[in-house]
From Swiss-Prot:
4-CDP-2-C-methyl-D-erythritol 2-phosphate binds at D8, S9, H10, H34, S35, D56, I57, G58, F61, P62, D63, N64, D65, R142. InterPro entries: MECDP_synthase, MECDP_synthase_CS, MECDP_synthase_sf. A divalent metal cation binds at D8, H10, H42. GO terms for biological process: isopentenyl diphosphate biosynthetic process, methylerythritol 4-phosphate pathway; terpenoid biosynthetic process. Belongs to the IspF family. Pathway: Isoprenoid biosynthesis; isopentenyl diphosphate biosynthesis via DXP pathway; isopentenyl diphosphate from 1-deoxy-D-xylulose 5-phosphate: step 4/6. Its EC number is 4.6.1.12. It comes from Brachyspira hyodysenteriae (strain ATCC 49526 / WA1). The gene is ispF. GO terms for molecular function: 2-C-methyl-D-erythritol 2,4-cyclodiphosphate synthase activity; metal ion binding. Disulfide bonds: none annotated. It catalyses: 4-CDP-2-C-methyl-D-erythritol 2-phosphate = 2-C-methyl-D-erythritol 2,4-cyclic diphosphate + CMP. The keyword Lyase applies. This is 2-C-methyl-D-erythritol 2,4-cyclodiphosphate synthase.
Amino acid sequence: MRIGYGYDSHAFAENRKLILSGIEIPYELGLKGHSDADAVIHALIDSILGALALGDIGSHFPDNDSKYKGISSIVLLEKTVSIMEEKNYEISNTDITIILEKPKLRNYIDTMRENLSKILKTDIENVSIKAKTNEKMDSIGRGEGIAVHCVSLLKKTK
C-alpha cells in the first residue's frame, strides 16, 4: 500500500467553462489555466503520482508545453492511470475535498464520483468527494477561486 497527497488551486476566470472531475458545472465563471483547469483531476493526479514517488503533474504534463494547451484533464488522468498500472498499482480509495464558495456542488457530486470511478477503473464506493466553503475567509472565501485537496491510497495488483 502507498499513500499520496495532492493539492491544486485555480482562480476563476471569465469566458471559461467550469470543469470539475471532468464534468461541466453550470456557472458564469470557469477556472483559469493552461489545460481545462480541472482542479479536482489535477489534485487527484498529484496524489497518484505522489503515492508512486513520481513527482507531480507539472513534471509529467508541463504547462509550458503547447500540446497540453486546452487539453481535457481526463486525458491526463487516463495517462496517469496507465503509469500507475505499469507500476502494478491500482486505486484502493481516494478522498477529495473541494473548497469554494460558489457554485454549490451538492447536485453534481454523485456524477463527479461516477465519472472519476470509471476513469480510475474502480468502484464508486472507492471515490469520495466533499465540497466545503471557506466561510468567506481569504481569496477562496471571497469567491476568487477554488482549492482541492486529495489523498489516494494505492494497492499492489501483483
